[in-house]
Amino acid sequence: MGNNSKHKTRKILAATATVTMLATGMIFSSDVFAEQKEQQKNLSTSLQKEKSVKSENRTFTVPGKGDVEVLKEQERKSMAFSPYEPTGLYAKPNEQITINVEGNQDIQVYIGTYSYDASWREDSKIKSFTLKPGINTIQSPNGGMIYFYNKQQGGTIRTTITTGGTTTPFFELGKHTKQDLINMLDQYPNAHAVELKGERVLITASPARVKKYLLGSNTDPVQLLKKMDEATRIQDKVAGLSEEQVDKHYVHYVEENHSPDYYMYATSYRTAYVGDAIQYVLDINKFVTDGWGPWHEAGHLRQQSPWKFYNMTEVQNNIYSLSVEKAFNQPSNLEKSGIYPKAFQYLEQVNKNYDEISDVFVKLVMLWQLQLAYGEDFYPKLHQLYRDMPSSELPQTDENKKQLFMISASKVAKQNLIPFFEKWGLRPNNDTIQKVAALGYPVLTAEIWKGTDSNPIKPDMPNVNNILEGNQFAWSLKGI
């Protein structure tokens, strides 16, 4: 399907096979130890010896953004955002890195970048250490970029890398210009990696591909990061999260050179782009006008598990892709790729089963028609509804997820959507039909399943915009 089929290359396996493994895959090295007294006395001496690196590049105030796994559970997501706070420093294999931690709280540090330094099958090569207050010395047999991770919710922890670590090109939005990036690449031509940090995104790529695709396309990294931050906030909105509510950890875009059979993929902590696929991240024109791949992969990090039922992994996330596409004033993928006629042909069948639709974009039409009919508030409210459900009431099986989705969608729309779902072959059971009827909302009569981006069909009901807000969503399935 045009350029969209390539984005699906082997992503399902990567996304599903690793999600539980990654949640527990941190490696704590025996090479970490705290030396609280004598080495701490030598801190200023050590700093003076590091004359080749400016002190501001060695001292970091690490914000407490919370625990990525806890935030994942709170938002009902399948995958976590990146825990990384970059330093711009690279640790060589087995190089001793000495870090001073101020205050009285522990902090974590990583050596290595997921997917950049190893394939998604080899996350154990990325090493994580818990640092105690005072002087700590760590090392990794594999080496890699150094990152901090402050699990605290709020506040900061001040750290200083006193010895070890090599400077690499590290571009920060609001601090550097395009010329600064050019100078960094000239100064460190053999750097292990180049990193670019926005307010909400982090990019890790090789110097060669940054030169080829970012500088080679005359992209201004300032504008690129701003546009990527914008895409992130568009997806925040779809998820119903304000700037104050949202997980502030970075959406990580990583160049991957270890999995040649793949094209792009997403799994916990990152989205990855194999080889030259990173051009869709580094070239601002491609990111804005042909960025379905990165939008799609970032969407995977947003998917809520309680309504990700059978064969929806590569469908549900495209709500976020379509939303970015629309906000960037690009033509609808569903229209330009001829998906609507295929969907309408399916809808004319007598015996339909939504689960058996093989084309993920045809399946996407059903989800998108709900937004076309009920407006851009529909999915933010649906996300909030699932976040507000007690954990004990979240569905665990595909069938229960599907049935609860039909009930939840009807609650958000304030309309009995059973006719819509039956038309699509989603097959509500008798219990679901009764629960939706008990909500007391008017039964859908408008043929919203015929809606398209250029010709949306609105429901024929009063007060369609009077949708529940905030804590009005708190509810229980018991007795419904």
Predicted regions and their residues:
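Bacterial N-terminal signal peptides that target proteins for export
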Residues: 4-16
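Short, glycine/alanine-rich hydrophobic alpha-helices that insert into or span membranes
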Residues: 13-26
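Sec-dependent signal peptide cleavage junction
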Residues: 23-41
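Beta-strand-enriched, solvent-exposed domains that form extended recognition/catalytic surfaces
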Residues: 37-172
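Beta/coil-rich, acidic/histidine-enriched accessory regions frequently appended to metallopeptidases
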Residues: 39-53, 401-480
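Exposed low-complexity, polar/acidic, P/S/T/G-rich flexible segments that act as propeptides
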Residues: 152-198
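Catalytic cores of extracellular degradative/oxidative enzymes
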Residues: 192-373, 382-383
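Active-site-proximal alpha-helical
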Residues: 344-433, 437-443
